[in-house]
Amino acid sequence: MEKSKRFWTEQRKREYIRSAEDNLFIIAGPGTGKTTLLSRRILNQIMGGERLSHFLLIAFTEEAVQEFKQKIKKHLYREIAINREASHRLKKKVHGIDLMHIMTFDDFCLWVLSVKKKETTEEKERNKIEKAEPGEEAEPGEESKTGEEAKKSEEVLSVEERCYRLLQEDKALLQVLRRDFSKIYADELQDLNQIQLNILLSLATDKKGKMRHNCLFMVGDPRQTIYQEAEEDKQVFFDMKKKMEEKKNVRVLYLNENYRANKILVDWINEAFRKRMHSYRDMYPSQRKEFLKHCPFHGVFRREFTGEDGIALRELVSEILFAYPDLKERDFLILCRSKEKQEYYKNSLSGVGFSDSALDKMVFEAHLSKGLNANIVIITEAGGNCSGKMENRLTRLEYVAVTRAKHVLIFLKGEAEEWFCDQYYGLHALQELRLGKKQ
């Protein structure tokens, strides 16, 4: 369905996403504002009379869950301020946001299983009372043994597998969930597995297997698949996309306009990954003139060093702060490959002037950086002599790392590099960061 809309402007697509009464499958690149779009669509549906209890929003992490709640509240408050006629009704909605079913997939599956467990327990209690003679207690006979065997059998299954099996076997429960959740949203679709997608489709389709009207909103980006190791798991997203393209009441749209990064970064990222990723789609910068004022310098740089990388990192950050004293901890994001290095770099920066709590928000393993961004992103341990196999495994993680930057991307290049192979990314050709000179 994207083909018929290929000449739509990015703005036209966004307007359509906010208000269209369609099932939507969105492929959204980094910095495209998907969280804001999703939140705005939910607000429009709330203003249209949809009850908060009818929404199910699946996020990949607990941090994303909280971010969605805050974004929806933010849009509600903004609407309250400008819409006097609806302000009284919307104020009541604000307090219900925290009670909405906005959760991770694991939490949702556990919730479904708990609903069934409660229902089963109540039914067993009723049966015991009905079967027992007056003055007698029901004996735990063969039925309890069967229950124990079933319990042991289920213990080897993941929570998603148990949930999906339950929905397949208990059609009455599935119908209740379909009735309760008329608006289903799924974020980070590229990192969901086949079982999780099957659960979504079970809820979003009717008894005949047809997609329910205006029920499902899915968003993801295959370039940011970092939690799927096996090739068949990475293929799940594309299989789902193909399936949705064949549905008459599903629209598939691409968003590639980057509102996060400046043109220098966007152009470099496109050039670096266009040949590295299958079916790569270029991003397009969308920045206002005042956007560049948010950071005192801009560009993609390298900083080479010899000796300890922790010392080199501390010296680099100290130089930047000395040159631009107005910068704060929120302007920095420092990314590395491992938990051990994360702690090492935090300790290395302890004398720079940032508090421990500030460093906890600045230094991350790269795979934990999704959803984060900063004016200045420093990539540590860059320039490694990666093998072909290592490169394939790391490419998507490297893409996630560099797309966190808004204005400045710095590769700290030393002697014990682990990723961003110089052979593939041409780091040696980048301008070396020398503060004090005009960049």
Language model regions located:
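Conserved two-lobed SF2 helicase motor
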Residues: 101-107, 359-367
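C-terminal accessory regions
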Residues: 381-438
